[in-house]
Amino acid sequence: MNNNIFTISKDANVNYLATICRIDNMTKMENSDHLYLSIINGFNIIISDDFHIDNIVLYFPVETIICSKFLSKNNLYSINDYDLNDNYSEVNAIKNADPIKAKSMVGFFSRNGRVRILKLRGQYSQGFICRIEDLAKYDKSLKDIDYESLVGISFDEVNGEKFCWKYIPEEKKTLTPHKKVNRRNKKLKRFDRLVPEQFSYHYDTKQLGPAIHEINPNAIISITTKLHGTSAIFSNILTYRKLSLFEKIKNFFGFKVNKEEYGYVYSSRSVIKNRYITKKDPKSFYGQDIWGKVAEVINKYIPNGMTVYGEIVGYLDGSTTMIQKDHDYGCTVGCWKFMPYRITQIDENNDKTEWNVNLVYNWTIGLINNHPELKNRIMPLNILYYGPAKDLYKDIENSEHWHEDFLQRLKVDKNFYMELDEPLCKHKVPREGIVIRVEDDLFPRAWKLKTLRHYGKEAEQHDRGEVDIEEVS
């Protein structure tokens, strides 16, 4: 079927898409007559006995916002926000006389439409599913569609309208003094230093669950620890020089002028911090440019053409504020550490080389050994496993269910501290998860597998309206 109804927008976050799925497994939960545990799109979901094997459903990941129209048309807002539901009048008429019935006529979503991780009878439920027929209540034109042919399709737009997106808490006023500074900087005349094709952001790391079949059992994989900090990129690449008046005149009359030079560029996950030459340095989250602080230390060790991608953890420089609450990773108060996890090298012909995990690790170890002053600033990648995927759990049969079995073993592997406390931290926090890469892959990519305990902690922080530095940088 040619699908032009369910589409992915240009700015979509691939980890927060709705997916059309088929239920192919259900395991009865202990101490419950009506609840089942099912693995849907690679995630653990608790479902009721209203669902059955082979049902086609619509799945939404945790921390996704579902559009208000869909929630309203399906009466999915909670009793506290029932005024947003289509059946408002009916519920309002019986709300006081029969509160139990009124509650049965509504859902459990708050006004923000956020999908929250739930824990029932000791089991986590990682997302929200509904019947595929509910789409027709949202849009009548979706009634007579062959959904069998669309199983596995992911999307964030329906008929060109935004349907779901990543949830980000509203920033508290006390945390956003940088906005005024950014507005002022936009008014300044700026010189763009960036040479095309020299700088690249890090690729999006996809959730492993929905993509588990992309892992070939025979592939050489690396498994590394996922740290909970903020992403950073440090490059020594060709940049444009700001020409002197004399050089501008020479250039105007056709004389050769060297317009490029190697220069340091540093960035957060999505914002290049020193792309422009301005009269003022931009402020950042919490009022401190933590990426700039790290750049001051690491830049001089990066050779021409190299870009280092990594994670900054610990504390904001000279501050008692943590980059991520309680995730100290052994840092003393006021100090940070930087862990490189990816390195690329670009030559004079713009040909880019991707380093494998072992080369990244060796470069980091060499940097620390040759420069002891960096011992408390730079931390090496924590490689947990390197080898054929099929050799990690040799007791798993290489059958049609290998991928599903492999995923389930990874989720609870205590050798990787999955669902255990993070041993790298002094504070008691769960490990965030692991990252998997395929060595000598056709193109650079990686998959992440987060722990359920981390999802739960993240949800609690969102409930309190706490903003993650990674979500606004």
List the model feature ranges, each with a label:
Residues N2-S473:
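Core nucleotide-handling region used for phosphoryl-transfer chemistry
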